[in-house]
Amino acid sequence: MLDKRAQILLKTLIEHYISDGQPVGSRKLSVASGLDLSPASIRNIMSELEDHGFIASPHTSAGRIPTQRGYRLFVDTLLTVQPLQNQEIRKLENVLSSPDPQELINKAAELLSSLTHFAGLVMIPKRQGAAFRHLEFLPLSEKRILVIIVTTDGAVQNRIILAEKPYSASDLTQASNFFNQHYAGNTLDEVKQKLHEELKQMQSDMTRLMAAALEASSKTADNKDGVVIAGKRNLLDVQDLSTNVSSLRKLFEMFEHRTSLMQLLDQSQKASGVQIFIGGESGYLPLDECSMVTAPYETNGQTIGTLGVIGPTRMAYERVIPIVDITAKLLSNALSNNH
């Protein structure tokens, strides 16, 4: 563990580097840190910090810059977070006000982007968390069937399935009535589990039809468009990112395809609060030059998604962390109130 003087110098160095992006020299540190140390003592501590991998020397400068490890120690133990003022929180509450859940999610992403000037993202809740209210089968042709699924959060899904055999309109009405009578109020996961058990016991046409409907619904829940991203273009204005065209291209490809982004957000959903991935910690190459700050959001006590911000590793963590945290809480409140 670093002693108090080394911690103060590291904190001062990182705060200055985040502020202006310039390598920090020992002379500036001796003035800014408030420590009564000789330049030689400061250089010795800087060498110690460099040996431990917390700072590094760019080839073009005599100053030092923080490494990924340095940022991690800073965020975990040295950072002083700046809480949002009540007036700011009230403004955010007014923005996150809508009876439409999808509009709330879009607004939350835009809010994160506008407040941080980075990319804001909100994972769209998967349908697994919502309970079924109503299901209807409608014949389109001999084997093509339109499935209409309505969930308790007001979402409506229309899916076309290809049945193994022809069904009459009366068969489909009977199947719809049976499903609504036995499964209304259950979540998608619960219904899938029950149908799985029933399929093991009896291979009935009705059970197979319902299983096909659920499979079609599940595919939608896991699609690549399951995240709203706002402010991607902000990252083009971030000097730390825009100078590396190759890395920036990979990052935008990640935004386009979204599968790995969804996996990372899914992983963050298991956290109890704000989670921070610095540089390569995420395990995804396009984010090696970035930091990602995330927080789960919920409705009525149940976690249903994750939101966050993607920006450079040189970001004002003391400001971004509370913005992500309060946005997650306000989105949770707004979604719960809608229910």
From Swiss-Prot:
Pfam families: HrcA (PF01628). It comes from the Bacteria. GO terms for biological process: negative regulation of DNA-templated transcription. Keywords: Repressor, Stress response, Transcription, Transcription regulation. One of its GO terms (molecular function) is DNA binding. InterPro entries: GAF-like_dom_sf, HrcA, HrcA_C, WH-like_DNA-bd_sf, WH_DNA-bd_sf, WHTH_transcript_rep_HrcA_IDD. Belongs to the HrcA family. Negative regulator of class I heat shock genes (grpE-dnaK-dnaJ and groELS operons). Prevents heat-shock induction of these operons. This is Heat-inducible transcription repressor HrcA. It comes from Methylobacillus flagellatus (strain ATCC 51484 / DSM 6875 / VKM B-1610 / KT). The gene is hrcA.
